[in-house]
Design a protein with these regions (language model features):
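Active-site catalytic motif of lipid deacylating hydrolases and related acyltransferases
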Residues: 1-57, 107-113
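Active-site signature of alpha/beta-hydrolase-fold catalytic machinery across serine-
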Residues: 19, 73-77
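Histidine-bearing beta->alpha loop at or near hydrolase active sites
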Residues: 33-35, 176, 192-197
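Catalytic histidine-centered segment of alpha/beta-hydrolase-like enzymes
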Residues: 39, 194-209
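Gly/Ala-rich beta-loop-alpha elbow adjacent to hydrolase catalytic centers
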Residues: 62-71
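Flexible "cap/lid" loop of the alpha/beta hydrolase fold
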Residues: 79-112
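Conserved alpha/beta-hydrolase catalytic His-Asp/Glu region
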Residues: 115-161
Length: 216
């Protein structure tokens, strides 16, 4: 049975993958470790990989959103077998231009912790979830988020400066993604109608594409 290491998104956990059908694989969910003060993204992801004993060569990895960016960073020193990137940026050039505003004017640092972990309709809109069950799951994930880690990870994303991309990968991206618009992304497999959380809303289509790629 093939093993695959799976990285979730910012403020998320393995529940976002609950609808994927990956029964034929041994799935290892990578859960976020607490960040160290002033730790950069490269140091963090390497520490994470060491903690979960991800092989330096030959591993299969999958990441959504922030988790995908973590994999891109790891791929600079790790020789992965198969890389699956979902609803993410493979380089800093894929990130929307408004991110630069928050880089130089980090108003998110002023947000109270309670605001960060309080789900709203704005979240539903940004993540592209309309189904009541999916909204309930997203709400629960947001409430369980760690506000301190959220701030550190958001800072890492906004200050990510990387143009080096992996040599081989499968990049699935929804054409309705409001957080990382597909217009900024190249070399993607377009998922029609998919938003940022299409891993929930389009799980059947995505499961098939992942399995086909991993079994090539």
């Amino acid at each position: 049975m093939k093993k695959i290491f799976i990285f979730s998104g910012l403020g998320a956990d393995k529940r976002v993958f609950s609808k994927l059908n990956l029964k034929e694989f041994e799935v290892v969910h990578i859960e976020w470790l607490p960040s160290i003060k002033n730790e950069n993204l490269s140091n963090y992801v390497n520490r994470l990989a060491e903690y979960y004993q991800i092989p330096a060569s030959g591993a299969n990895v999958l990441g959504i959103s922030f988790g995908g960016m973590c994999i891109v960073e790891l791929a600079k020193t790790y020789d992965f077998n198969k890389i699956v990137l979902i609803s993410t940026a493979i380089s800093s050039s894929n990130l929307p231009s408004y991110h630069k505003i928050f880089r130089y004017f980090p108003i998110y640092k002023l947000f109270p912790s309670q605001l960060i972990v309080t789900p709203t309709r704005i979240h539903h809109f940004l993540f592209g979830v309309t189904d009541a069950v999916d909204r309930k799951l997203l709400n629960a994930i947001i409430r369980d988020s760690n506000s301190g880690f959220f701030r550190w990870a958001l800072y890492s994303i906004l200050n990510w400066d990387s143009l080096e991309i992996p040599k081989k990968f499968l990049h699935l991206h929804g054409d309705k993604d409001r957080i990382i618009p597909i217009i900024n992304c190249n070399s993607v497999r377009r998922i029609a109608g998919g938003g940022h959380l299409m891993i929930l809303t389009h799980h059947n289509e995505i499961s098939i594409l992942i399995k086909e790629y991993l079994n090539e």
